[in-house]
Amino acid sequence: MGSIRGDLQPLFVMPPPPLDEDCDDIFNSDESSWGLLSLSCFGIIMGLWFFASVCLIFGVYGSETVWLGPNSSILVKPSSIFVKSIKVKELDFSKPGLQLYGFNGQSTPSGYFVNWTESRVLSVSQNSYKGWPYYLNRGTHMNISYNILPKGSAVRLVITEGSQVIGMPFFYRSSLKDIAFRDTAWSWNLIQGSGMIQLDISKSKGYYLTVANLKRKDIEVELDIDVKAVLYDTKQTSYNCSFSNGECSFKMNERYPVENYAVVTSPALGQGVSIDDEWYIELSYQPRLIAYGSFTGVLLSFMLVAIHFCNKLKCCGGEGFLSGDDSVRTCLLADKGDNDCCNDVEASNKSLCAICFDAPRDCCFLPCGHCVSCYQCGTKIKRTKGRCPICRKKMIHVKRIYTA
């Protein structure tokens, strides 16, 4: 009976702490996760900027082709930040008369109205169409009077945005039904007999007027087109080019916020120009690569600074978050048996383990004294060569806190 006491095991057993292990961690996964998150954000933002740059160079400021008729005036106003120069090339270099005007550091060229009338008599064969281009600026007004012969016949008068296919290679051409029944047409009219169509232009753009005959007989169409067009004043220009070699370039002013504009014009009717004359040009923009490089550098620097400050805030915020445990840490290090310290420890045990969120906090790390986990999780951190998850100091011992 006297030997029973010697066989009893103590209620609480403290495993001997391994004191010679190096410190590397369960919580290195936190640093790895933060690093991956930073790299992901960095990659996403740089990828978005690359996508935006491609859209600017090949989309907004990509090359475009435009059909021009007589009395046309095109205003081009790209950003001098991203565009170094404007190049206009005449693709059908057979008719003189085009002009390129440049404006540096001046206000937008003022507009004025020009009136002219076109009379066209079209003989449209069966299952065919005829058409011609216009470039019309916002505010232009058109009155189209028509007369269809023989009586009782009907044709479709379709006006589409953008250049049409007349004069293009066969593989670019639309079929008759595509033109006559185009759902995206800006204006679509089935006309017969006599009448008039009124059109108000709300967008500066190239337009193509097409007369399509789907009948199995030839039809004659008489059109009187009265145009009140908006053209741009080019009297105060700082640059002028007459396309003597088939192309012209206008260099943008690099000083910001100086505004730069270019205006391409075609000759008016009556200057050796008929209503059937057309010009086919290509507008292209030379990108200012130094601007894209500068924006990339600024964005890269901003991202690196942001990541640096986030790392500092994360580190400082982590320690400050549990700064209230400093009294517990100081008390435990100063006097293990002090009653006030035990009371503080009892209060801290009301919080759950910051790692497993299951057991109460019943241990502290030495020498720093932080109390943020249960004893089981703290022992795992120590045995896996960890550091204190709060201050990242090397852990020498995990001290278990006993409560009544």
UniProtKB/Swiss-Prot annotation:
GO process annotations (BP): mitotic cell cycle; pollen development; protein ubiquitination
Top-rank taxon: Eukaryota
Catalyzed chemical reaction(s): S-ubiquitinyl-[E2 ubiquitin-conjugating enzyme]-L-cysteine + [acceptor protein]-L-lysine = [E2 ubiquitin-conjugating enzyme]-L-cysteine + N(6)-ubiquitinyl-[acceptor protein]-L-lysine
Main location per the UniProt record: membrane
Pfam families found in the cross-reference section: APD1-4_M, APD1-4_N, zf-C3HC4_3
TM segment ranges: 42-62, 289-309
General function of this protein: Involved in pollen mitosis II (PMII) regulation during male gametogenesis.
Name this protein carries in UniProt: E3 ubiquitin-protein ligase APD3
Name of the gene this protein is made from: APD3
